[in-house]
């Protein structure tokens, strides 16, 4: 049984329990493979989980990703992955959240799932009086036309993996090496650049609370990490 590291994160309603795992700073590939294994091994009564991580610098190309949108990767590795969407960048100072949820148990569809994630991000930014919005046909969250959070998801047998990336206090220069999400010239921004906090912990706490509210979850933090080994 996993050791509980802290009290459950509060939610506005009693809800379904979900394990919360803070992975710290990790390379992308081991976490990607771990969430694939978790999703493949899920059974009807497997508890949902939410993983939180900061990744080492990496560009990822989703299933719709076109190599020509990677303009000048330089020393930053490029990985083709199995999420939806185009190309994006992950790096230190960006909060990445992977909700591993059973949509059938939550009784929501994929469209509602995406909308709930976007609303959690919008409500998180409102904590610091940052007015954000969603765009029809372009998943993610935007402030004044600049993208501050990207979504890239995969659903297998009704269960989600991959998730969201939220620019908190990071070097945005690598985004100039790609066409973010497949859009040439798309501007990006961060919480810090918009007058919000620089600390990841402050933003993380608010976002997790908002996600718990949107999905009706009671988050149960655990110190146990998933198996992050890579296949031989």
UniProtKB/Swiss-Prot annotation:
Pathway assigned in UniProt? Protein modification; protein lipoylation via endogenous pathway; protein N(6)-(lipoyl)lysine from octanoyl-[acyl-carrier-protein]: step 1/2
Q: What class of enzyme is it?
A: transferase
Q: Which PROSITE patterns match?
A: BPL_LPL_CATALYTIC (PS51733), LIPB (PS01313)
Single GO cellular component annotation?
cytoplasm
Which residues hold substrate? 83-90, 150-152, 163-165
What positions belong to coiled-coil segments?
none
Localisation per UniProt entry: Cytoplasm
Q: Which reaction does it catalyse?
A: octanoyl-[ACP] + L-lysyl-[protein] = N(6)-octanoyl-L-lysyl-[protein] + holo-[ACP] + H(+)
Matching InterPro entries, A to Z?
A: aa-tRNA-synth_II/BPL/LPL (IPR045864), BPL_LPL_catalytic (IPR004143), Octanoyltransferase (IPR000544), Octanoyltransferase_CS (IPR020605)
**Gene Ontology terms: biological process:** protein modification process
Q: Which GO terms describe its molecular function?
A: lipoyl(octanoyl) transferase activity
Q: Which SUPFAM superfamilies does this UniProt record tie to the protein?
A: Class II aaRS and biotin synthetases (SSF55681)
Q: Which EC number applies?
A: 2.3.1.181
Start and end of every BPL/LPL catalytic domain?
44-219
Q: Which UniProt keywords apply?
A: Acyltransferase, Cytoplasm, Transferase
Q: Which family does it belong to?
A: Belongs to the LipB family.
Q: Which HAMAP family match?
A: LipB (MF_00013)
Q: Know the name of this protein?
A: Octanoyltransferase
